[in-house]
């Protein structure tokens, strides 16, 4: 049994509870109430005075690199990194080697996760065979085997007819399509956002239209097919406007953005910082403001990390040769609190919705909620703690965080999943 004392519970922006004790028996919340009787001989007692307790988080877009790229990350190490950041459900993308484009690979991911992961790992299947963009994968079999979505993330399905057919099949099989929106004819050879910083550094720029053109195309295809389109890692103000328009039309579209897009601009690249090389690229302050407004209005539904680990040798090279991507599990909540709550006045309950309720709804899962009779999946956070992101404290195999050296506010201290304490006072126990 676990007894959490003096918990300030936050389930969502509309459903907050006053301070209470939480009694966990086995894997469920047995009781929530004032002054629950302590029994130190039978209970693990955690005093959360001055801290907040909220449902654990879900990430619908990450990369675990297994199979094929285990030197960057694997299911075990990636799951531990996610756990360190408060995530107990993560959805891994299919751009592995071989790609997750058939039912056997879906089965492998599920089996491997059950074997080595302390948390829930849900596979995303490919839209096309080999992520080639040329022939649809067997979407029905992929869904039947347990995929929660389909995506060619890392690559855009450039053929509009292939994408249209994918949406039609996805509707028949009731599975969302997660779209990586990038017109590669416009972005080819690009390194960073096309603009001031690309001009002064001499790095080839990626025009913002590379994203927004495909966003517009896929919205129109979703409008026609009535399928569920999810647009991932939104980075431009134009994309926000297009998604808002689509929702006003009644299109079945949802969207996410990532912590680095709502906090950092293209200027992070100055000095040729390869950790700031991500895809889509970091944009401008104007884009950040549009994304934040989109989150406030509900145009952008949730936050994903796009956790993209790379080996140090893939980043410690000339900028144009460096791999794109940043790790994100361990800093996600703190970045959102620092840049949305502290700097932009968001309610802490809104962050819980962006990391729990909304992403789970998108992939068809019921939300984690702190309530009697529900599974005990929760995190304890210290909202006042300030900490610097340092390589030596990163749990992930890879250390390529764009937030290295940044000072963040709030810290996920303790994580409980299915009634088990997997992280306590900052230390993982799995």
Swiss-Prot record:
Q: How does the cofactor attach, per the note?
A: Binds 2 Zn(2+) ions per subunit.
The superkingdom listed in its UniProt entry is: Bacteria
Name the keywords, alphabetized: Hydrolase, Metal-binding, Pyrimidine biosynthesis, Zinc
Q: Where is the active site?
A: 306
What InterPro entries does the entry give? Amidohydro-rel, DHOase, DHOase/Allantoinase_Hydrolase, Dihydroorotase_CS, Metal-dep_hydrolase_composite, Metal_Hydrolase
Pathway note: Pyrimidine metabolism; UMP biosynthesis via de novo pathway; (S)-dihydroorotate from bicarbonate: step 3/3
Zinc as a keyword of this entry, yes or no, is: yes
Xref: Gene3D superfamilies: Metal-dependent hydrolases (3.20.20.140), Urease, subunit C, domain 1 (2.30.40.10)
Coiled-coil annotation reads: none
Cofactors that this protein relies on: Zn(2+)
Listed under GO cellular component are: cytoplasm
Which chemical reaction does it catalyze? (S)-dihydroorotate + H2O = N-carbamoyl-L-aspartate + H(+)
- List the PROSITE patterns: DIHYDROOROTASE_2
A Pfam short name: Amidohydro_1
Gene Ontology molecular-function annotations: allantoinase activity; dihydroorotase activity; zinc ion binding
The residues the record assigns to binding Zn(2+) 1 are 61, 63, 153, 306
What this chain does, per the record?
A: Catalyzes the reversible cyclization of carbamoyl aspartate to dihydroorotate.
- Write out the similarity annotation: Belongs to the metallo-dependent hydrolases superfamily. DHOase family. Class I DHOase subfamily.
Q: What is this protein called?
A: Dihydroorotase
Gene source species: Caldicellulosiruptor bescii (strain ATCC BAA-1888 / DSM 6725 / KCTC 15123 / Z-1320)
Instruction: List the gene name.
Output: pyrC
């Amino acid at each position: 049994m676990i007894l959490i004392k003096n918990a300030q519970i936050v389930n969502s922006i509309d459903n907050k509870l006053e301070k209470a004790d939480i009694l966990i028996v086995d894997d469920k919340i047995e009781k929530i109430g004032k002054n629950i009787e302590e029994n130190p001989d039978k209970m693990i007692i955690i005093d959360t005075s001055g801290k907040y307790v909220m449902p654990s988080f879900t990430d619908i877009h990450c990369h675990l690199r297994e199979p094929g790229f285990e030197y960057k990350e694997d299911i075990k190490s990636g799951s531990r990194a996610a756990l360190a950041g408060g995530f107990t459900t993560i959805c891994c993308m299919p751009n592995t080697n071989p790609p997750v484009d058939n039912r056997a690979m879906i089965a492998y991911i599920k089996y491997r996760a059950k074997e080595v992961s302390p948390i829930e790992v849900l596979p995303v299947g490919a839209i096309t065979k080999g992520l080639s963009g040329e022939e649809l994968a067997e979407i029905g079999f992929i869904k039947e085997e347990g995929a929660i979505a389909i995506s060619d993330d890392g690559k855009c399905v450039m053929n509009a007819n292939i994408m249209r057919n994918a949406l039609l099949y996805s509707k028949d099989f009731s599975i969302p399509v997660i779209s990586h929106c990038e017109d590669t004819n416009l972005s080819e050879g690009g390194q960073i956002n096309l603009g001031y910083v690309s001009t002064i550094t001499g790095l080839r720029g990626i025009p913002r239209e590379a994203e927004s053109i495909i966003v517009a195309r896929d919205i129109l295809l979703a409008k026609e097919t009535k399928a569920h389109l999810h647009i991932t890692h939104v980075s431009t103000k134009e994309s926000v406007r297009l998604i808002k328009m689509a929702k006003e039309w009644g299109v079945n579209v949802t969207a996410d953005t990532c912590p680095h897009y709502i906090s950092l601009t293209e200027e992070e690249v100055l000095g040729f910082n390869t950790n700031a090389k991500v895809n889509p690229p970091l944009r401008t302050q104007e884009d950040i403001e549009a994304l934040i407004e989109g989150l406030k209005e509900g145009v952008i539904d949730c936050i994903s990390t796009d956790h993209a680990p790379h080996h140090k040798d893939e980043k410690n090279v000339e900028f144009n040769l460096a791999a794109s991507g940043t790790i994100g599990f361990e800093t996600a909540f703190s970045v959102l609190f620092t840049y949305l709550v502290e700097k932009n006045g968001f309610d802490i309950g809104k962050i819980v919705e962006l990391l729990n309720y909304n992403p789970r709804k998108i992939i068809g899962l019921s939300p984690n909620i702190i309530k009697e009779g529900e599974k005990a999946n929760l995190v304890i956070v210290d909202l006042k703690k300030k900490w610097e992101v340092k390589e030596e404290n990163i749990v992930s195999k890879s250390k390529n965080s764009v937030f290295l050296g940044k000072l963040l506010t709030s810290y996920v201290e303790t994580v409980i999943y299915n009634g088990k304490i997997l992280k306590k006072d900052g230390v993982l126990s799995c």
